[in-house]
């Protein structure tokens, strides 16, 4: 349930970023990391629902954690002339060349959940996992009365 809510929140942020200054988008290509995880399944569903609501064409491709496939999918989006590419990178460094090529073609790029390293994008929508870990640690400490042992598996 939490993951579905998070996916909706993330996509709401993505939708807002897309609609800010590019409301006339004719097409969006989304390359997601996987569909083997409930988070990404929910994210894809939320994206499709929002695109339908906004009347925007959306093509979702699934990289299946394969960088070569993701790069080919992004290349396909560039060839099709989409206005926006949303990507959850398989490899934060490996997607740099594809993002650069998309940007040179005038396509806005938004990264979701996983940031791209060493390249600026239109927007990054994600969580602060470090802060989340700190909050989880604080909750565990409170739950055991600030003393005891905790194992993370």
Model-found features: residue ranges?
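A residue-level marker of the well-folded mature domains of exported/periplasmic proteins
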Residues: 2-9, 18-153
């Amino acid at each position: 349930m939490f993951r579905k809510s998070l996916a909706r929140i993330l996509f709401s942020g993505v939708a807002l970023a897309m609609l800010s200054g590019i409301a006339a988008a004719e097409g969006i290509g989304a390359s997601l990391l996987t569909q083997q995880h409930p988070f990404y399944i929910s994210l894809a569903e939320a994206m499709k629902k929002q695109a339908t609501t906004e009347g925007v064409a959306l093509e979702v491709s699934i990289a299946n954690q394969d960088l070569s496939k993701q790069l080919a999918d992004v290349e396909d989006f560039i060839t099709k002339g989409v206005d926006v590419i949303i990507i959850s990178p398989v490899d934060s460094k490996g997607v740099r060349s594809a993002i650069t090529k998309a940007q040179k073609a005038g396509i806005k790029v938004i990264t979701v959940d996983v940031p791209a390293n060493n390249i600026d994008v239109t927007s990054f929508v994600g969580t602060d996992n470090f802060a989340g870990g700190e909050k989880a640690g604080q909750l565990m400490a409170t739950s055991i009365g600030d003393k005891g042992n905790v194992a993370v598996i």
